[in-house]
Amino acid sequence: MYSSEHSEFILSPLVDLLKNGLSACKGTGDGIESFPLCEYVTQSLFLKLTGAQEQKIKCICWDLATVDYEYRYEFLNNKNYGECSNWNSKNGVYNDLIRAIQKINSSFEPSQLFDAAFLTNILNEILQVYEKSILIIWLKRELCFYKANYSSIISARQIAQIKQPNSKVYPLFQSLLKDKFEEIVYNHRNRCAHNTLSYQINKPDFNAIAKEDYEYNSYFFRYTIIILIDSILMSLFNKYLSILPEKV
């Protein structure tokens, strides 16, 4: 199977980064004296996950551009993925991978890789990570809400669906999950990465906090959405490598 210098990094699951970060907290104990660490640890892990995902996407683009000169021209001249942090960049690279696979195997459809079992395995693994970590102590109420409600926004119908009629792109997520990404992942990423949480005007106001669906703004949902995107992109990249000639 073809391999590049980026392959190992791209195929390293972000869920392992989450596991390692939470494992590092085991020595802190679970008494009340550990609670001040909660926001620092969860925010630091969030930034590590978003940063790693952005670097992965850049590496995927470079690997595609190394093999496909037409894609290289398109990537360098017409695509504007920036830091690869927003929705358009993630959905764009998702489609770039699909098109790269379809150039070799024209019958390929993403539904061949992504089904209910694929999603169930990911969600079960993530939930096990949460339940075996200090988060079950620090964020017990938020975890209970997550367990009771994650299936309402994260389902097989929300990921990797077929193209809509007259559309040229495949949707990575349907509108419900896409909106959640932008609301609870991307917006929070910008607050944390640019340190705008230090400005009161950038914080959610009381009206936003009082809304019934504000409880989705938790690190449990943020981590899950990031890891779900990562798992989808890894599966596509692995499929791409498996059908690419060893010498290109």
Predicted regions and their residues:
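Generic hydrophobic secondary-structure signal
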Residues: 46-49, 53, 57-61, 109, ...
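Glutamate identity and glutamate-enriched acidic tracts
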Residues: 5-8, 33, 39, 54, ...
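Intrinsic-disorder-associated interaction segments
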Residues: 3-7, 11, 46, 86, ...
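Charged alpha-helical initiation segments
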Residues: 1-47, 51, 56-82
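Helix-loop junctions and short alpha-helical segments
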Residues: 61-169
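Polyanionic, low-complexity intrinsically disordered segments
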Residues: 2-16, 20-23, 138-248
